[in-house]
A protein has these predicted regions:
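Hydrophobic/aromatic side-chain positions at a characteristic register within alpha-helices
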Residues: 26, 32-34
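Short solvent-exposed coil/turn linkers within tandem alpha-helical repeat scaffolds
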Residues: 49-61
């Protein structure tokens, strides 16, 4: 009897038992990992770390599991990333064929444009050109001849409309050429126009010049498609570039996780 009492006393003094809640979170994280639910596994590990920091033995087990979760979650993200990047690359190749490359001697930089939209005398006319720069950025150039005092342009279809921000005359982005005026909108300022054209591909739209006076010009479905093609090409190029950068980040994360597992 005395021996049994002594064993009980030693067991009680040897350290407290683990918390059932902490063990439950770790078991849940392990089960989620086995089920390939890496988001849930991460959430449970985070909850365990925050709620039961004093459970050092269980935290050590969690520390061993976490890099495995990160590794598999990252591999899944890389696979998804690669699929999206391949899709963007195919889209870029296809839409590039619909565009023309223009680089004249007087130009500092060339651009891609729909062949139907290219007009060497563009700055002596009234309209817009959707262009894609050498690095894949979509931008709009508007020309009004004679002058309208315009500072922005809008595309409309019924009650739906998209417009650029106003770009006041500054002699640089908004400047004068002979009897006309030209505005080169930045990629950020042009995005709404490109997106609207892509959403309304195949439709006739109204182009409106806004400023001191207004002028509305009808765009044929072919003209709208030219804007949409340029925007789609730019979106694919910039999307693939962004995904390539994201892949490099994911590869670095994967290496860190594997180093922790080694």
């Amino acid at each position: 009897m005395a021996l049994s009492s002594g064993l009980l006393l030693l067991t009680a003094c040897g350290g407290k038992s683990e918390d059932a809640g902490a063990r439950g979170l770790l078991d849940g994280a392990s089960q989620a990992f086995d089920a390939h639910d890496y988001t849930l596994a991460t959430q449970l590990l985070d909850s365990l770390q925050k709620t039961f920091p004093a459970e050092t033995a269980i935290q050590r087990e969690a520390l061993a599991l976490r890099p495995k979760v990160i590794e598999q979650a990252t591999l899944l993200k890389i696979s998804t990333n690669d699929s999206l990047m391949a899709l963007d690359q195919v889209t870029a190749e296809q839409t590039k064929k619909t565009l023309r490359w223009v680089k004249e001697p007087r130009m500092v930089e060339g651009f891609h444009i729909s062949p139907a939209a290219y007009n060497p005398d563009f700055m002596n006319s009234t309209g817009i050109q959707a262009r894609v720069s050498e690095i894949g950025e979509f931008y709009i150039v508007s020309s009004a001849n004679p002058k309208l005092g315009h500072t922005s342009v809008a595309l409309g279809a019924g009650t739906s409309e998209a417009a650029t921000p106003a770009v006041p005359y500054d002699g640089e982005s908004n400047y004068r050429v002979g009897s006309g005026e030209v505005i080169t909108f930045s990629p950020q300022q042009s995005d709404t126009i490109g997106s609207f054209a892509l959403q309304n591909r195949g439709k006739a739209l109204t182009l409106t010049f806004r400023g001191k006076s207004r002028k509305a010009v009808k765009l044929t479905p072919a003209q709208v498609n030219g804007i949409a093609d340029a925007y789609a090409y730019s979106s694919a190029i910039t999307g693939a570039r962004r995904l390539a950068a994201e892949r490099r980040k994911l590869e670095a994360m994967l290496q860190v996780a594997r180093n922790q597992m080694a």
